[in-house]
Regions:
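Conserved, well-structured ligand/cofactor-binding cores
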Residues: 1-461
């Protein structure tokens, strides 16, 4: 027989004989065959393990859970955190919006794994650690899932996203320093403008990213406020006195991150503005990164029929039909990531608006999208730094050609001969395809020496 019979409040359920999950997990596995199996992010499962262990220690300290059960729950949770039980969490994102089935998946795994650790066989005899009464003691799905997702999202941001962005910032800063003396023509509206150094242009990029990281870091305090202790609707029903504050301390201890009990549990259950806020910062970074990637690939366009001011690394052949073609693939990958993050933000915004009365029921959607975005931005920034920015070179020949040919150098004459005479020189140079100097001299507005003294790109930056 390849299954065992387990019971829940709705009756008997056939559960695969060799798995640690139980009847409620199996019901969900059968009822929600939507998308890939096991799509619930494993980071959320690890967040659950941290909070379940913290709850067990808190419950014991407050006198409502015996030490043997505390230690068994803690041991199983450590196994989960270490990745030893990853295959025991088969549920999908697309389930109940409170994440109840995933909460019960974790509870059942804790219960049955503890049963085996005590020397018993799955499905035989009464379990010592009960899924609802012990693993879920002083808890509700309504306060555990938001706590698990905040732990997961916070960890992903500080462990993956911020380090990736920081690496890219440093790479761009190094290039800005390297390019600080290279004068090029600036562009506004995609048209020629006044001169700028390539280093100044790159300084704008890393400054944008620094503001984005600042926004992301500023969102973390809200994300550190956990709902655990609010139980079903925020009142804390069925929790011992002092539970909320103590469990937050244990979560901080076991996660290595400072978490605090949410000031208002009703807000913590019914709204997830912390997710909206943090992902808003990720969207800000995506918008910034999209601008940077587009600028770089346009400046690298060519190599002979485009702008060609930058030379980007030749990482791989670019065409199956055109020999020798190399494409700005890192820029393309990064802009696709940006599009995905901006799309995820739309879903999160919609999900954040679905807090009806005392509970938001879009928790799996919101948390999974943030985890995806946080990972994508962190990974993409690191890849872009290593495989594009670090290898960029300036094409000084092209840069000088465009600089010297630009009509917008005439702007330097505004304070010498006035805007209208300067415009007349520029228009004549353009219409007759001659240089600015030739046009200025032919109009008798300047001497050759005056032009050379006044129209000098080095004095315009």
């Amino acid at each position: 027989m390849d299954y065992r019979i387990e019971k829940d409040t709705l009756g008997e359920v056939k559960v695969p004989f060799n798995v640690y999950w139980g009847p409620q997990t199996e019901r969900s596995r059968k009822n929600f065959k939507i998308g890939p199996e096991s799509s619930m992010p494993i980071e959320i499962i690890y967040g659950f393990a941290i909070l379940k262990k913290a709850a067990a220690y808190t419950n014991h300290e407050l006198g409502v859970l015996e030490i043997k059960k505390r230690d068994l729950i803690g041991k199983v949770c450590d196994e989960i955190i270490d990745g030893k039980l990853d295959d025991q969490f088969p549920l999908v994102i697309w389930q109940t919006g409170s994440g109840t089935q995933t909460n019960m998946n974790v509870n059942e795994v804790i219960s049955n794994r503890a049963h085996v650790l005590l020397g018993n066989k799955l499905g035989e005899g009464e379990v010592f650690v009960k899924a609802n009464d012990d693993a879920n003691k002083s808890q509700s799905s309504n306060d555990t899932f938001p706590t698990a997702m905040y732990i997961a999202c916070y960890k992903k941001i500080i462990e993956v996203t911020i380090p990736g962005i920081s690496k890219l910032i440093q790479s761009i800063k190094q290039k800005s320093k390297e390019f600080e003396s290279i004068i090029k023509i600036g562009r506004t509206h995609l048209m020629d403008a006044t001169p700028i150094t390539l280093g100044q242009e790159f300084s704008g990029y890393y400054s944008q990213l620094e503001y984005g990281v600042k926004s992301l870091k500023n969102s973390l305090p809200h994300l550190s406020e956990i709902a655990l202790g609010g139980t079903a609707v925020g009142t804390g029903l069925n929790t011992p006195k002092g539970y909320s504050e103590l469990v937050a301390k244990y979560i901080s201890k076991f996660s290595g991150i400072s978490f605090v009990s949410a000031k208002n549990k009703f807000e913590a259950l019914a709204a997830h503005d912390a997710i909206v806020e943090s992902h808003g910062a990720l969207k800000q970074l995506a918008i910034c990164l999209n601008k940077i990637a587009n600028d770089i690939r346009m400046m690298a366009s060519g190599p002979r029929s485009g702008i060609g001011e930058l030379i980007i690394p030749s990482n791989e052949p670019g065409s199956s039909i055109m020999p020798g073609k190399v494409n700005p693939t890192q820029c393309e990958a990064l802009t696709m990531v940006c599009g995905q993050v901006i799309g995820n933000d739309t879903a999160i915004s919609f999900g954040g608006a679905q807090g009806h009365y005392e509970l938001n029921v879009f928790k799996p959607l919101m948390s999974s999208n943030l985890l995806i975005s946080a990972r994508l931005i962190g990974d993409a920034c690191q890849s872009f730094a290593e495989n594009c920015i670090n290898g960029i070179k300036a094409n000084k020949k092209k840069i000088n050609q465009f600089l010297n040919d630009s009509l917008m150098l005439i702007t330097a004459l505004n304070t010498k001969i006035g805007y209208y005479k300067a415009a007349e020189i520029a228009n004549k140079a353009f219409s007759e395809d001659i240089t600015l100097k030739e046009a200025a001299i032919s109009l008798n507005y300047l001497t050759p020496k005056e032009f050379d003294d006044w129209v000098d790109p080095k004095n315009m930056i």
